Every structure is written in C-alpha cells, then in structure tokens.
Amino acid sequence: MPDTRDVNGALAQYPPFWEKVGEYRYTEEQLDTLQINIGLACNFACKHCHVQSSPARTEEMSRETLEQCLKVFKDYGFSVIDVTGGAPEMNPHYEWFMREAAATGARVITRSNLAICEEEGYEHIPELWAELGIVVFASLPHYIKKTSEKQRGAGTFDPTIRVMRRLCELGYGKGEGAGPDGKTLELDLVFNPSGAVLPPDQEAMEREYKQKLAEEFGINFDNLFCIANAPGGRFGERLLATGNMDRYMNKLIGAFNPDTVPAMMCRMQLSVRWDGALYDCDFNQAVDMPCKNGLNIADMANEPSIPAKRDIVFANHCYACCAGTGSS
C-alpha cells in the first residue's frame, strides 16, 4: 500500500514542469488578481478537494488579516478580489469583507458550493451577493444528481439546484442589466472531472450544461469553466491510494500545451492563505509551497514598496494548469 501522505514525493519523480516554462518563470510586473483563501471549514468534504476542506477544519482568516488584504489590494493596484475557501461563507467576517471589497470598485468573485446558503445563518447570502454585484463561481460536478453526488456525497445536489434557482430569480445568469438597479449579475459554473481523467471540451460541455439545466431546472448561467484536477491534496492522496497517480500524470504530461503557459494564473495573481502566508496559487497552498520571498500579507501591507513581481515556484502539480486548453 503506498504512503498516501507523500504526494509531493511521488510527483517529484516526473519530468520537472519548470523546465517547460522558459521566459515565463516570473509574474507580470502588474498583478491583477488578489486571491484570498479565508478559511478551510466547509459543509462538504469533496473527494477532489485539493485544500482538503471539511466540516472538521477550523482554520479561518482573522479580520486583521482581511484588512491587510484590502490595503494591499489598494496599494498595489489589483483589479480583482477572488474569495475562496473551504466554504468562504463560514468565515465570521465574510459579510463584512464582501461589503468592504465591493466598496473598492473591484471585480469581486466569491467561490461557493451554493448548498451552504440553505444552512442556518447563511440563508441571506444570495441576496447579499445580488445587492453588491458579486460574481459567483459555483462548483457543480454534474447536472445529473447521481453523478454529482458520487463526488460530493448524498444530499448535496438538490440544495445546490435550489440555490441556483434563487440566484436566477435575483437576476443572475440573465445577461447585462438584469439584476437589481440594473446590475449585471454573473453566475459562472466550475466543472471538475470525478476521476483520473482530463476535462472534456469546455465549449461543448458549456452548451450541454446550459441546455440541460435550462430544460430540467429552469436555470441560466453565464460561463462554464472545465478545470483539471490538480494531483495534490485529497485528490493526490486518492490517486496514490488507488494506484492511478502514474496514469494520471502521464495524461497531464502528454496533454501539455505550451500555448497555455503565458496565461498561467500564477503569472497574474497573488494568493493569500488564511494566516496571511503568500503563495503563487491556491494549488501551491494545498501542497504548502509558499512564494520564494517567504513573505506574509502583513509585510506587504506594512511596506508597500516591496516589489509585486516575483519568481514563481513551480512543481509537477502545475501540469494540471497547462493540459489541453489550460485550467488557469
């Protein structure tokens, strides 16, 4: 039986990803996205979760660190605030932070499993999003209940669909100016394959999702993003435990597309962990590979002359972002 904890060691056996990136081993001078992981608590414990969120996790970002994130966002000229978790709604400062983030004029994205909005204390969240014009990125493993719940667990599909309907009633996914006060309310869905396979063609999958969700549930949305599962965290452990790591990695490496390298998300963003530690992306957070400079968001908040441009830390889970048409 393989040691399922040694995912990083297993990944290191493959051809080094960093050799593939050439001149793109640095970030851009001007970063556009500040991605903030505000906590690892979640009402789900999905099989593919790279950050290993679950109801048992207690890590959460403090208000002080959130305030530092807002300061860095303004000082460094970011244009997008991307809030993730866990289920980010479970952070006690979430609503306050959403209001503060929206007040900056940024494009504010929240990532959600949506079903959290049917749990006690979170029922008002969809109305908050609509009021503030928040962009909602919702994960939906499949439009077929049985397939979706194979990845997420029993009882997860119906509440997700009900909340999606609520969002549509509020004006989400209906095009420009359909929301309150003429806002454009964007609802995007995120699809991850359930096993050791690459995602299907994104355009074809989006057409299929739009047709099925509209016909069966009366749901509209804007975009579908097909994301390859990064071979780290809970998914990486499962690959090792089932003997599928080698097969999956060979698929990723075989599908490497050099045209996706310039647009890797790590080149345009800074990712902040719940405790303020800085990473090149959320996947690097999952395998605990911090930025080379070893800084915390507090360092940048206190000293805004620290350069935003940096060397990027690469490892072999990065193949997931550059397979096929890319997942950044």
Regions found by a protein language model. Name each.
Residues 2-85, 89-100, 104-106:
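Conserved alpha-helical substructure of the radical SAM core
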Residues 22-25, 255-259, 306-309:
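Short, P/G- and charge-enriched loop/turn segments at secondary-structure junctions
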Residues 30, 45, 77, 132-133, ...:
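Short loop/turn motifs at secondary-structure junctions
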Residues 42, 46-49, 266, 276, ...:
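Short cysteine clusters
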Residues 63-83, 91-192:
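Radical SAM/AdoMet-radical enzyme domain recognition
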Residues 141-265:
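Radical SAM enzyme [4Fe-4S]-AdoMet core and its adjacent flexible, acidic
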Residues 272-273:
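Short, acidic, Ser/Thr-enriched surface-loop or helix-capping motifs
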Residues 277-328:
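Flexible mid-to-C-terminal extensions adjoining Fe-S/redox cofactors in radical SAM and related proteins
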